[in-house]
UniProtKB/Swiss-Prot annotation:
Isomerase among keywords: no
Primary role: Together with LptE, is involved in the assembly of lipopolysaccharide (LPS) at the surface of the outer membrane.
Native source organism of the sequence: Francisella tularensis subsp. novicida (strain U112)
UniProt name for this protein: LPS-assembly protein LptD
Lineage: Bacteria, Pseudomonadati, Pseudomonadota, Gammaproteobacteria, Thiotrichales
Subunit and interaction comment: Component of the lipopolysaccharide transport and assembly complex. Interacts with LptE and LptA.
Length: 868
């Protein structure tokens, strides 16, 4: 037996150091189970006395409050009233950090003796410190290896605490039996905490969530595989003072290899009251994707009734997974949804499908699916997408108001293969469309490209910096099947002309660029050749079977930069003034003998003034003899590069009338001015674009076109946005477009219809009223149709360890008339409900409420806890 004060037994073998202290208790607060010294200065001198020994959480005589306090102390919970959760878990590593460098073991106690077999029996504030590991207890039996160079195993008893600062693991138990060689151990009755990685969003930050799972077990065992096995225990994510919910189980297994926790034969408890039996439950203990049930969902929709969804996530392999979701609809029956995702070295993609084996209302099987994949190998890229739906009402009946689906009239079917490098951009595209609603007329059905081949070349790198030679080649075969000739009921089948189009465009451009300005003239000569396959059933007839068009495009783009730096109390800034001229000349050519395959007219906006062609696609090239003059100004913060304000204003002066329009063949628009009432104006509208940081967190943007001759504003788009550090969001957007060219369908163009005005307003917000309560809302109103297009309101209650949210939505289904996609249909109500236990989020879960909130500008997935 070792006796005497300040006696040390020093055993130094290799890199392991044991320091044994006899009858000497350190004054150190790190050991949570020993009597600490409390010291204060009295009359200029230290006055110390022993503090009372902390109460044991296992003491059956403790009151509920005393037990919570004891547990908080044992798990190193530090109170911080300014935090919503009231504190945080401490993971102080100051006592083991140095041991990671020295690779030594620090062993201390008050009394000790050796058995004949060399076993060390220690008592009184036993403390074992190693790199990133702390063990404390009242008594310990320590077995050393054969040469006494390291600890082989130990048994600790009394008030035992085990800590691992790097992982945040803390175990409070009555006894510990540990094998130091293989890292296995077992305990008696134990309380514990485990760290849980969470998204960096408001309800999961350190002020609103502890970031840990904690629990209790009759026995706590770590096996040689690394798995942790608990018996007769529970888990929760509440702090030591929060017992809002628990998941209990006779057996709780934590697989450290798959990072999953499995609970068997347990209950879901609220305030210690069992409310639901759980025969089996699994959840991840980190952010990695793991198989298991995800949160069930609740939705109510007028078209399908009440739906309850139960999703299950399969983590099949590191590079592919599967999500299955069973939905029980009160009016439709069972619906099975599945999403399979995969990723290889060169490809990634997913399959999304839904199937209703038997629809109670329709009396038949219904479904839809989407298959998409992309690939990349060095400079080669591929893309494939195929969509299918069983009938025209499927999206309306089962999308629960999803605006991406209830507005869908076409199904994408596309394959792309491209090769690109610094000098070549080439590709092959095969594109076709499926029709959701068979009433879609043949004119309004887009052309298929069977196929389209492109080859673009540039001389960059081969010619001087001031010279660029390029060529653009695009060869396409356009094909369209027969469809309704018009919108009348029982309309006969009609066709559109099919054709081959060859587009070649060589270009020479000069680039005279300096730090203070630039002058970039260019000459381009698009050559178009069409081979038409006319048919008597074509809704638009063309006189010729072949058409050739050659048009030169001459352009000069010039500008200068004037910079000025200045400094104020807020920082250093650069103000830039950028005057710009853009001249374009294109001779006139009658192009009404060319069909419209992929062409429409753009709305006039500021950036459109710096394009040589106001038409999209390649079937129309406007005539032009025009000059754009513009002035741009901006202020930039030099420290972070953010733009505080930018303003742009410009106008085009026309030296010739715009004669090219969208008339084609024998369509009903023979008057060249019918499609564009401003084609003879000398000046374009004055076009402006503004972006301005009004003050911190408040941003204003606007685009306004003012026609001087008519003295009216015919294009105005405004957006006012606010978002602060607490993720409070408020947006107001207003659109008023006098002539909305982009809304015209191909049939309306063929009939010579004038573009209709568009006027809408959208208000949206997410407000975290308190740490508990948050609201989200959106309201979109169409002034022309005097109807709400979309509206929803959501409510979230956020507690320390759980959250609940609900949302009501009313959406106008716009796909009721596929030939008039801007026409709002009837409003349909949808209700959604979600419940979440913090820390038990199902990886891969897709939140229906989150998909609605993404319509709010500034919202990021996860701000309401969705998608965890």
């Amino acid at each position: 037996m070792l006796k005497g004060i300040h006696k040390y037994l020093l055993m130094c073998f290799g890199t392991v150091l044991f320091t044994v202290q006899a009858n000497a208790a350190r004054i150190m607060s790190n050991n949570p189970i020993k009597e600490d010294w409390q010291c204060k200065v009295v009359d200029g001198e230290w006055s110390c006395k022993r503090a009372k020994k902390p109460k044991s959480v296992f003491d059956k005589k403790l009151t509920k409050t005393e037990k919570e306090k004891a547990l908080a102390d044992d798990l190193a919970w530090v109170k911080k009233p300014s935090y919503f959760v009231g504190g945080y878990y401490s993971n102080d590593s100051q006592f083991t950090k140095a041991l990671c460098e020295s690779k030594k073991t620090d062993l201390s106690y008050e009394k000790s003796e050796f058995d004949n077999d060399g076993t060390l029996i220690a008592s009184g504030n036993v403390q074992v410190l190693q790199c990133d590991q702390e063990l404390y207890g009242n008594n310990a039996i320590i077995n050393l290896n054969s040469n006494n160079s390291a600890i082989r195993s130990l048994v600790m008893a009394g008030d035992v605490i085990v800590k691992q600062p790097s992982t945040g693991i803390v175990i409070r138990t009555t006894e510990l039996d540990a094998d130091m060689n293989d890292g296995t151990y077992s305990t008696g009755e134990a309380y514990f905490r485990l760290a849980r990685e969470m998204p960096k969003t408001r309800i999961y930050d350190k002020e609103h969530f502890s970031g840990y799972l904690r629990g209790y077990a009759k026995t706590f065992k770590k096996e040689s595989s690394g798995d942790i096995v608990l018996s007769d225990g529970y888990i929760t994510s509440g702090d030591p003072y929060d017992n809002a919910w628990k998941i209990t189980g006779n057996n709780i297994d934590i697989d450290t290899n798959t990072h999953m926790a499995y609970v068997k034969n347990g209950y879901f408890e609220i305030q210690d009251i069992p409310v639901m039996y759980i025969p089996y439950f699994s959840h991840p203990i980190d952010d990695r994707r793991r198989s298991g049930f995800l949160y069930p969902g609740f939705v109510q929709n007028a078209n399908s009734g009440i739906g309850i969804s139960v999703p299950y996530y399969f983590n099949l392999a590191p590079n592919y997974d599967l999500m299955l979701q069973s939905v029980i609809w009160s009016q439709r029956g069972i619906m099975e949804n599945g999403t399979f995702r995969y990723m290889t070295k060169y490809f990634q993609g997913q399959f999304e499908g839904s199937l209703v084996p038997y629809d109670f209302k329709e009396g038949k099987m219904r479904g839809s699916f989407t298959l998409s994949t992309t690939g990349q190998y060095e400079n080669i890229n591929t893309n494939f997408k195929y969509e299918y739906v069983s009938d025209q009402n499927y999206y309306n009946d089962f999308s629960a108001g999803n605006v991406n689906l209830v507005t869908k009239t076409l199904l994408d079917r596309e394959f792309d293969l491209t090769y690109t490098n610094d000098y070549v951009d080439s590709g092959l595209t095969v594109l076709d469309y499926g029709v959701v609603n068979p009433l879609l007329t043949v004119d309004n059905t887009p052309y298929a490209k069977l196929p389209e081949v492109k080859l673009n070349l540039t001389s960059d790198g081969y010619t001087p910096d001031y010279l660029t030679l390029s060529a653009q080649t695009l060869n396409t075969f356009f094909y369209k099947t027969a469809g309704p000739a018009n919108t009348n009921p029982g309309a006969p089948q009609g066709t559109n002309v099919n054709a081959f189009r060859a587009y070649e465009s060589p270009k020479i451009a000069f680039n005279f660029n300096k730090t203070w300005g630039y002058l970039n003239p260019s000459l381009e000569v698009p050559i178009r050749y069409y081979q038409l396959k006319n048919s008597p059933t074509d809704t638009i007839q063309f006189a010729n079977s072949s058409v050739t068009s050659v048009l030169p495009i001459f352009n000069i783009d010039a500008g200068a930069y004037f910079d000025k730096d200045y400094t104020n109390e807020n920082g250093t800034y650069t103000s830039t003034l950028h005057p710009r001229l853009f001249y374009t000349y294109i001779p006139y050519q009658d192009q009404t003998n060319i069909p419209l395959f992929d062409t429409s007219l753009q709305n006039e906006q500021y950036m459109q003034m710096f394009q040589v062609n106001r038409f999209t696609g390649y079937d129309r090239i406007n005539n032009a003899n025009q000059l754009t003059y513009a002035l741009e100004a901006s202020t930039t913060n030099q420290e972070d590069g953010t733009t505080l304000a930018s303003a742009k204003i410009g106008q085009m002066a026309y030296f010739a009338d715009r004669k090219v329009n969208l008339c084609q063949g024998n369509s009903a628009c023979p008057n060249p001015g019918l499609m564009d009432p401003f084609s003879t104006d000398t000046f374009s509208p004055i076009m402006t674009s503004f972006e301005f940081q009004v003050m911190k967190n408040i941003y204003l943007s606007a685009q306004v076109n003012y026609r001087v001759k008519q003295q009216n504003v015919d294009y105005q788009v405004y957006q006012l946005s606010y978002k602060d550090e607490n993720e409070n969001i408020f947006n107001v957007s207003y659109n008023n477009i006098a002539n909305n060219w982009s809304s015209l369908t191909q049939q309306q163009i063929a009939e010579g219809a004038k573009p209709q005005p568009q006027e809408t307003i959208t208000l949206s917000t997410i407000l975290n009223i308190t740490d508990h309560w948050g609201i989200a809302a959106l309201w979109n109103y169409n002034f022309q149709q005097k109807q709400i297009a979309n509206i929803f309101a959501g409510l979230q209650y956020n507690a320390k360890s759980w959250a609940v949210r609900a949302l009501w939505q009313k959406t106008a289904y716009t796909n009721q008339d596929p030939n008039n996609p801007t026409l709002l249909g009837p409003l349909v109500n949808t209700y959604m409900f979600e419940f979440e236990l913090k820390g038990l989020g199902g990886i891969g879960n897709t939140s229906d409420i989150s998909s609605r909130l993404q319509q709010i500008n500034g919202y990021q997935v996860g701000e309401w806890g969705d998608g965890i």
